[in-house]
Every structure is written in structure tokens, then in C-alpha cells.
Amino acid sequence: MDADAVRERAADLPTEPGVYQFRAGETTLYVGKAVNLRNRVRSYADPRSGRIRGMVGRADRIEFAVTDTETQALLLEANLIKRLRPRYNVRLKDDKSYPLVAITDHPVPRIEVTRDPEEGAVAYGPFTSKGRVETVVKAIRDEYRLRGCSDHKYANRDRPCLDYEMGICSAPCTGEIDPESYAEDVAAARRFFEGETGVLADPLRRRMEAAAENAEFERAANLRDRLEAVEAFHGEGGEAVSDHSDDRTVDVLAAAVEGDTARVARLHSERGQLVDRSRHRLDAAAVGDDGEGDEDGFADPDANTPAAVLSAFLTQYYAEREFPDAILLAERPSDPDVIDWLEAEGVSVRVPGAGREAKLVELALKNARKRGGREDPVGALGERLGIDRPARIEGFDVSHAQGTAVVGSDVCFVDGSAETSDYRRKKLTDRNDDYANMRELVRWRAERAVAGEDDRPDPDLLLIDGGGGQLGAARDALAETGWDVPVVALAKAEELVVTPTGTRRWPDDAPELHLLQRVRDEAHRFAVSYHQTVRDEVKTVLDDVPGVGPQTRRRLLRRFGSVESVRDASLDDLTDVDGVGDATADTLRERL
């Protein structure tokens, strides 16, 4: 459209509030709101921004919708932007929450790391490093032996599971511990997450020193690493700045912009304690090539400022969500209508200058600025591998115990975020052969895809958890079925990327490597979780070894951690375990 066409169209528009769209064919280029539709649209006849001139030039028509109020226009604009995803608007792209530690609301509570706590659970966090949180939770279970099983499994046990044998659960399900003692252990775990580091650090330190005195140096080193993680946990944690006298629900928001990409960090506080944290990536339309903004009140030229990003985020995010009691902002949004709308809904909106609230805003701003300038690891991954941008990645892993309870996982990431609705899992043939297991898993996926029996789109990339052997097995499965999909592997030990043309070591801080690690770790977690479910139905082979009763079995698993480690242990190591003599050690080596 040229300037005359824009003016002619504007003359036909009402002077009421509403929403307008610049369209090219069936594509919506831009959605905007206006207090006065005629005046706002007329202002596009002479935009100063080169980018906006380009948008108007591509448009072939302008459509509009009248609303009763400015607030209705604000909400309609937000919903249209989310649905139509116009190129020239700020668009909310993703929403990823951070992990919490939850102690469930159950007569015999369990402890878990989760992003979605059960109703009534006591949640601590959120935390930025899931790995560090899991290390601490493992230390708590090892020391206080809190259960980690589902309530369904807890209610249906008639004998202790392997967690009890390994010393990480006190088996309250079968009465191996009385309720009062278990409650004391739960209370100790709660005290740790409320800031009392010593309830976990002190016993860990004693165990580490005892292991060193007994010349168990490997065990002492492992305990030292765990102790360091525990002692550092609350150092970064004030991650939850808390005030138990505050009974409001509060959202804290800050935005950071780099180029055409913006990131908004959101902290959510309930009753004075942070209970959720998320970061949201947005596409922000930049100013025109001439570097000048638009003076006609048009929002788009300044969309690469934090204030404009906050305006867009607030309307889109809260249009479909429950309002908090208060919203704290790093700066005021560029659009005053947004503040008016929120305050009309009973939300207190402030930009704090000092005190606890200012600290929360600083924390949000720190998170918003995190990883600035490295916003498309998916694109970087495609460039690194020499393939098209792998928007859809599926990750595969296999989990088993000595060839029993063999299962496989198939997880899916879309644009760098987990697509849990597309996760799949499969029981595999029981055998102690990692390569054959991976070949069977990938062949199952490939055959279903080729036959049109899988309701999911084909992925742009397959990621195998493993090294060259697992990658070769996966490629064999693809060749056998004729399914043409790029595939690579990620080896755990040294984080090497294995491709069909060779092994690569990528920089530790490469965002594309971090993406592969997230997919790999999620495939591993999903496989292990399913394996544990299946494993509960399988007797450990130690049950069939003469001379190994429940007490000895428990000591072996507690000492070595798994049946595989028992099998690999030397005779001297085996006889170091109470209850295992030379004859029993020989029998163990023979049977395993």
C-alpha cells in the first residue's frame, strides 16, 4: 500500500477504540490497538522507520475490529498476536519453569525434584541448576532415607523395594520405621531447605572423615564432592528471598533486549516465598535501518526497548492467566494503558526503589540478562552439523539392570523446549547388549514412521545417548527401514559429539552443546524413570545367590550401588562387606 491508499482507508475507519491488522494476502503482518482507529491508521501514511515503511509497502489491505473500551482493545490485540504471530509484532515464544524441591502433603511424605508440585506440597526454590538440586536431594535421601516412590506404589508394597536395600529409603511402606521416627527425618529435611545447612553437612562431613580414615579414598572423594554441593547450596540460594509476613501473591518482572530478541524473567512469590521462576523469550521487531524511531505513537519502532517488551508481555501473559495481587517491575511499561488495565483489575503495579522488593527486581533482571546474545541454539546446532535448522529433535536412551527390565525412551524437543505430549517409551527385549537394545529402539520408531503409524511429525534430528557404538546401531536401524533422518550421538564421559563423519569436541559454553545435553539428559531421565517402574516387578539376581540373605544383600547394594558393581568387585572388596566370607564371595563371582 502507498501513502494515498493508507490515507484513503483511514478515512473510512471509525473514531472509536479497536484493533487493526495490516495484511498481505492471508498473512497478518502487524496487529495494533488504538484509542481512535482513524487517527492511528492514518499515521502509517508517513512512517519514519524504514522497517515500518517496508511493512506498509508489503500490505495489501487493512482490517479492523471496533471494541467498546480501550481495555477490550488491549486484550483483543494480545490474543490476536498470540494466535496469528505477526512478523512485525513482539511475540511471546516460550515459557520454561525452573525446578523446585517438593515434600508432599501425605501422612508419609515423599521428597522429589519437580517443576509442578502437587497441591498441598511444601515447595522450596526455585533453583537454576537441576543437577545441583538432584545432588542435594540424593544426599538427603542417603542420610535421612526419605521415600521417593509414588503414593500408588507406597500403598501397594508388601515388601521393601531396592531403594531400601540400597539404604536410600527406610521403607515406611512396610513398617521398617515407625511413623514418629520418619516424621523426624522429614522435619530434618525441611530444616535444611529452610536454611539450616548443618543438618545435612555435619553428618556428611563425619562420613567423609571416617571413609578417609579407613583408606576408602574413592568413597571419601565422592562424599567430599557431595559435601561441597551441600555447603554451596544456600550460598546461591537466597535464590528465594523470603518474607513470611507477606501473604500476597506477587509477580516480579524484568526485561532485557539484545538485537531483535528479548527475554523476560518472571519470579512468582506466594506468602513471602518464591515458588516459581520462568524465563520467556520474545521476538522484538527492531527499529528501521535508518536507526530512527517513529514519533507518531506507533509502538513497533521502539519494540526493542525493555519498556515496550514489558508492555507486550504483560498483555499477552495475563490475558489468559489469573492476576497476582501485585506486580513489581524493573521499569514502567511504555504503554500506560497496560498499567491502567492491570490496576482496574485490582493489581498493584510498582517499580520499587529499595528494600526486599528491589532485591527481587534485581534478581529478575539478572535472570533476564542471562545468556544474552545467544538466543538461537537450535539454529546454531543446525549450522554446526551442516543440516537445516532442527526445530524438532528426538532423543533416545536405553536403561536396564544387567539385561533385565530393559526399556527405551524417546523424548521430543521443539524449538529447544521439551514437548512432553510427544514423549514415548517402550519395553525392549531383555538382554545385556546396549547396541542391540538401541538398534531395536530406533528401529521401532523408524518402522512406525515409515508405515505412517506414528501420529507425530518426523523429527529434524535424532540424538542418541551414547558413543560411536550406539550411533552405529541407530544408523543400522535407519538404513534397514529406509527412514532418512540425520542422527548424532552425545557421549557422556567427555561430552563428545559423535557424527557419522567423526567425533567432535565442541566448546563447553556452546549453546548448541547445551541443547544436546538437555535433550540427552531428559532422554536418560525418562528411561531411568520407566526402568525403575519396571524394575520393581523384577527380582534382583542377588535373591538367588546361596548364602546371601536380606541383610547381606542390603549391605552389598549399599556398598556397591548396583548389581553390576557387585559383579565387577574384586574378591577382596566383596569380603570387606559384613556377612560375606570367602565362600560367598566365590559364589557371587560365579553367579554374576
UniProtKB/Swiss-Prot annotation:
Q: What do the Gene Ontology cellular component annotations say?
A: cytoplasm; excinuclease repair complex
Matches recorded under Gene3D superfamilies:
5' to 3' exonuclease, C-terminal subdomain (1.10.150.20), GIY-YIG endonuclease (3.40.1440.10), UVR domain (4.10.860.10), UvrC, RNAse H endonuclease domain (3.30.420.340)
Give its localization.
Cytoplasm
Q: Name one GO biological process term.
A: SOS response
Q: Which UniProt keywords apply?
A: Cytoplasm, DNA damage, DNA excision, DNA repair, Excision nuclease, SOS response
Primary location group:
cytoplasm
Q: Does the keyword Lipid metabolism apply?
A: no
Q: Which family does it belong to?
A: Belongs to the UvrC family.
PANTHER family cross-referenced by the UniProt entry: UVRABC SYSTEM PROTEIN C, UVRC/OXIDOREDUCTASE
Q: Tell me the protein's name.
A: UvrABC system protein C
* Organism of origin: Halorubrum lacusprofundi (strain ATCC 49239 / DSM 5036 / JCM 8891 / ACAM 34)
Originating gene:
uvrC
